[in-house]
Amino acid sequence: MGISFSNIGTVGREQLITSGSNGEPNWSYIPSKGKSTKTQNEFVSEIKKLAQKAANATDKTEQDSISRQVLQLRAEYLSEVAPDRKQLYQQAKSAMKNQNTNPKCKGIGELTLLDFLEQAEGKNQNLADKQIALAGGGTLKFTILTSGGYGVQIQSQGVNVLLNTGAGWGYEMTPAELTKKDEFYSIYWKEYNAVKNG
């Protein structure tokens, strides 16, 4: 499993790579509704402790470990305002199982030139033309990947709340999550800078 730590806290879209064993999203790093029962004071205390550890970290291994802990805590912190990504994922999985009965539904690397030519001539309908409404309020869409096959996008609240483009699962933050993320990093960097400069 790989995770990018560059520019932590500065982007609205996160790309996280799933564990290779099951291909499922790594829910440790992806915010989803109802993930935590901690109080605001408990969160602030944990955020400050991680910022202090990060400010005092001396080697790359320790810094990477702290960065992973920060991302996990951030996912938990954002869960208060996050869409129910887990539920949407389960609904999308169920909808995709129904699509697998279609002989034209192919996985990564399985689209052929013939598939594209038939599509251009209007002889078949591919998944990229479909949008499937999910019970949780989201929409399941499929994208044709440049590597062949289909990627998956689960959209809700105007953003891709979960997506897989062949390299792993990622997500975009809703406006409420972006605000909450800024709040998280405001606490984090204030404490980090206080320790570094103190």
PLM features: residue spans?
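Type III/flagellar secretion export determinants
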Residues: 1-198
